[in-house]
Amino acid sequence: MEISTITMILDTTLVAVFAWVAYKTGSLIWKYTPYSYPNARIRAMEARLLSDQRLLELAESKELENFVVNLEDSDYGKRLSELKSYSVEEIEKALDLSFVDTILLFQKIMPKRVRGFFEVMLEEWDVRNIVNVVKAKITGLPAQDFVIPVGKILNKVKAMVEAKTMEEILVILEGTEYEEPVRKLILKEINLPEFEHLMYSLHYQKLLNYVNSRKGEEKVILSEFVSSLIDSKNISLILRAKASGINAEKLKIMLIPGGSISRNVLEAMISAEDPLMALTELEKTKYAEVVKNSREAVEKGDISTVEKQLRRYIQQRMKEQSQFYPLSVAVALSYMLQKENEIRKLKAIVRLIADRVRPERIKEIVGEVT
């Protein structure tokens, strides 16, 4: 073989190798670099989460005004400074809005290929507001007190607050995906709890649709996150339904599709004699540890312990994912769950202070909140 031919083959091979290396390098840069800045920022935010010691100090506030003052230098300070009064409702709204601020930030700083997920997550506040307004209208409570001023259709929600009848609310929601659940409620095809469940089911379906449009690591992480949330909702629904004696056939219809638990397991839970037997059906799923840690509580009729254990499981899984995929959307999801848990503890402290519970007892209770 002539030297020129060998040289040509070598040149062609080198070009192919360099092209492959360039392609792989470009793929890695496209895949991971967009997460460098947002995840560094989120790690800094994690460092500002309240320590257990800080929570114990807040438990000693004695007055709600002191509680607010003690959080002035935290990430909640901005929203708390806008309070109209030091009432439980106003403080809880400020804490909720602080959480919304977090999602809005992620929507802004995360890579474009996952921003849409946080946009859909924000729509949960539309669902919450609609459900809260409808509940208030039906029970005769002031609807405005239950509205969080945020959401894609906030103007419609405000119009709902002013509506005199459920029929007016239906007209306001005409053309949205929320029109049909309200129509079914008005026609008495579903009751209020079923209406609420249907509304949240629509939201989770939108999250699933978005997840299924992704690929690679993003799809893997987001899929586990959303399917775990759906599992949590379905498990809670079944256990509470078993405790209150809801019809099995009606319960099957209310299940949210898209979770990781198989239909056979869910139906076995529905067919179980009582909540404990239903919980036992989860022993061969990834929730075996949840079963182990909450069996005794369920025997005593306490379903909330299962819900706490499920939240803890999801939070731990996202933390593990954020460590395994340090340059991924898992970091944002893990932080979001930590923040949500922190707000849950803060709300518990607020209510207990308002109820004049002793600081020592508040510390005990908050330690149990998850």
Curated annotation (Swiss-Prot):
Transmembrane parts of this sequence: none
Keywords from the UniProt entry: ATP synthesis, Cell membrane, Hydrogen ion transport, Ion transport, Membrane, Transport
Any one GO CC term of the record: plasma membrane
One Gene Ontology term of the molecular function aspect: ATP binding
InterPro entries assigned to the protein according to its UniProt record, in alphabetical order: ATPase_csu/dsu_sf, ATPase_V0-cplx_csu, ATPase_V0-cplx_csu/dsu, V-ATPase_V0D/AC39_subunit, V-type_ATPase_csu/dsu, V-type_ATPase_csu/dsu_dom_3
Subunit structure: Has multiple subunits with at least A(3), B(3), C, D, E, F, H, I and proteolipid K(x).
Protein name: A-type ATP synthase subunit C
Organism the protein comes from: Pyrococcus furiosus (strain ATCC 43587 / DSM 3638 / JCM 8422 / Vc1)
Native organism taxonomy: Archaea, Methanobacteriati, Methanobacteriota, Thermococci, Thermococcales
